A protein has these predicted regions:
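His/Asp/Glu-rich metal-coordinating catalytic cores
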Residues: 87-236
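Short, charged helix-to-loop "capping" segments that act as catalytic/coupling loops
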Residues: 71-78, 109, 114
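N-terminal active-site segment of His-dependent metallophosphoesterases
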Residues: 1-69, 73-76
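Active-site neighborhood of divalent metal-dependent phosphoester/pyrophosphate hydrolases
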Residues: 11, 41-59, 76-90, 200-204, ...
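Short N-terminal secondary-structure initiator segments
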Residues: 1, 15-16, 76-103
């Protein structure tokens, strides 16, 4: 049996006006680490909005690295993290060459591919592609396949989008890409996962999304994505 801890929206470095919330965040992350150990979790997924700003404080960055190192158990438990709409994609991927030796994989750009190979902790990155990674752990006799869908705005995908029907083109592009990856790499002989940082609704839904707080960077509109349809999630 595979045990997964899924977490997201840490917003490290968040401030409430002039007050830092780093002390609260340390307590929450300590509890997450304890749960991962108590439940003997095999895999940790961190699904975006790791930081609260594009340029996080030194204290926030230090807290992230210390927490992920604990969660990875010195490279014996994989941690896979993607960027959200609050994160800088370049900043998130910056420590990847060092972090991967501890089994920590960052992914934030659709044009990047995680390098394959066996790490010191025993984890093997057996297959990878743009938006996809397959992991093999020594204790498991089946692979773990993860479709990686970090937040992406229309600017980052502008080469694929026309001026007209931009919203429809964006949805179609992502949905087709996810399905192609699922068809190519996923089958019943492994555990197939999708990890993304988007806003999904059912097509034709008449229920408007909840209003975002003024302090939130919008995930819908203002250069961000429109909502995606649940029908665009891949079938395996």
């Amino acid at each position: 049996m595979l045990k997964i801890l899924h977490t997201a929206d840490w917003h490290l470095g968040k401030r409430l006006q002039e007050y830092s919330r780093i002390a609260e965040q340390k307590l929450v992350l300590e509890e997450i680490c304890q749960i991962a150990d108590q439940e003997e979790v095999d895999l940790v997924l961190l699904a975006g909005d790791i930081f609260d700003t594009f340029n996080p404080s030194h204290e926030a960055v230090e807290l992230l690295y210390k927490t992920l190192r604990r969660l990875s158990k010195n490279g014996t438990r994989p941690v896979v993290a993607i960027s959200g709409n609050h994160d800088s994609s370049q900043f998130v991927e910056a420590p990847d060459p060092l972090a991967r030796e501890l089994g920590i994989l960052f992914y934030s750009r659709y044009d990047s591919i995680i390098s394959c190979g066996t790490l010191d902790g025993g984890m093997e990155i057996s297959q990878s592609d743009s938006g996809f990674v397959e992991l093999r752990l020594p204790k498991l006799d089946f692979p773990i396949r993860i479709l990686l869908a970090p937040y992406a705005n229309e600017v980052s995908l502008r080469t694929y989008l026309g001026e007209e029907n931009r919203e429809e083109a964006f949805r179609e592009l992502l949905g087709q890409n996810w399905q192609q990856l699922a068809d190519r790499y996923c089958d019943e002989n492994g555990v197939n996962l999708f990890m993304g940082h988007f806003f999904f609704v059912e097509e034709g839904s008449t229920t408007p999304p909840d209003a975002e707080p003024e302090s939130e960077r919008p995930i819908l509109h203002v250069g961000g994505t429109q909502s995606l349809f649940t029908q665009q999630l891949p079938n395996t």
